[in-house]
């Protein structure tokens, strides 16, 4: 029985899943928007949101915790210098998931996951 088992397996063993979400979380922090499958996006929220909450209070201990979870020095720097102050007044809900259809090869549901206060390039969104 699967009583009290949380999280999705995603057809991966534990170390593969941990490495995948560590890489995806680093990419999301670095680029502030990524495209992935819908189940991975929903599960990625559970990894990224606590990282941003951790970054709201800057301390050496919190930076070490964030580094232990991401293993990327640049990502830790961006978390504590940009994202922590940006989300200081927001009590959670730092990510948004937008569904974007189905993948051509295997019809998997795809989604964009982005950070909520993401600056949008005005010149990139032009109507023709």
Swiss-Prot record:
This is Large ribosomal subunit protein bL17. One of its GO terms (molecular function) is structural constituent of ribosome. Belongs to the bacterial ribosomal protein bL17 family. It comes from Tolumonas auensis (strain DSM 9187 / NBRC 110442 / TA 4). The keyword Mitochondrion does not apply. One of its GO terms (cellular component) is cytosolic large ribosomal subunit. The keyword Cell wall biogenesis/degradation does not apply. Part of the 50S ribosomal subunit. Contacts protein L32. Pfam families: Ribosomal_L17.
